Amino acid sequence: MGEKSKGYVFIAIAGLLWATLGLFGKFLMGNGLASEQVAFTRLFFGFIVLGIYSSIRTPQILKISKKGIIYSVIIGIICQAMFNLCYFKAIDIVGVSIAAVLLYTSPLFLAIFSKVCYKENITRSKLFSLILCFIGAIMAVTGGRLDFQGLNAFGLLLGILSAIAYALMPTISKNALKEFSSSTILVYSFLFGAIFMIPSSKPWEILNYANNLDVLFCMLMLGIVPAALAYIFYATGISKGVELSVAGIVASVELVGSVIIGCTILGESFSLGKLFGVMLMLISAVVALNLSYDEIRIFYKSSKLKQIEKTESI
């Protein structure tokens, strides 16, 4: 297997690791943790693991200026804390598969933000891709039945808000990445996101689960698997020479993984309409192959890891 082929495998693994977000989150919430506490757990343990890994492999990326701290605080609050909070709340209310589908509407909001903030053109090809994504999302959420009465409106709103927070990452951080490594911003945004979550998550209450080894293990895995380890695998794939645009498409396996986990392990509803909707969303990602679609992954899918390519050989 060639180096680039290995890169594709690593990126696909990263996507599947991200897909476990809902699985770990659902287990923890099912054992009594609030969604705020689950969000805090992911950010806190993710920061610890990534911080340790970075200090061993590339300690220079932990150096940060006052300006970098300001960027990290803003991104940590808006794009990390708010994203995780909304996403886990959506998972708790509407389930893993629907929450994942709603999250993947983020390219729609990215296109709007890019147009408003940076005057980027929405070409016909990009518009076609976004329309496919929108139709696919509706099909996947409703199962092909245009009946929204059985759906929880608040849960859907939270899913959409998570997509908005997700799309705000490249919008807010575009200038920051001209001066700082995305890994630097990632580590510290996890830290400040966790700090911001302290008042609402009341992490000291999590100590009540100190005797529950299953919960403690799952909390640690939440910080390792869909957080630190997924980013490390993605960075490894990029370092093998995989094109950034192609990497964004390969990582879309996350959506498929999330739906499969939701429908099989967690027993969520499944229909041909939902399958068709997910397929449309994946097709929209392929259509966007030569567009700027993968900019949405600056942090969560790390498609801007150019600094790692230059400074780190994983």
Where are these regions (language model features)?
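Glycine-/small-residue-enriched transmembrane alpha-helix faces in small-molecule transporters
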Residues: M1-T41, F148-N175, I195, Y300-I314
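Helix-helix packing/entry segments at the starts of transmembrane helices
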Residues: T41, Q80, A99-T105, S173-A194, ...
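Specific transmembrane alpha-helical segments of multi-pass solute transporters/efflux pumps
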Residues: G51-S97, M139, G223-G241
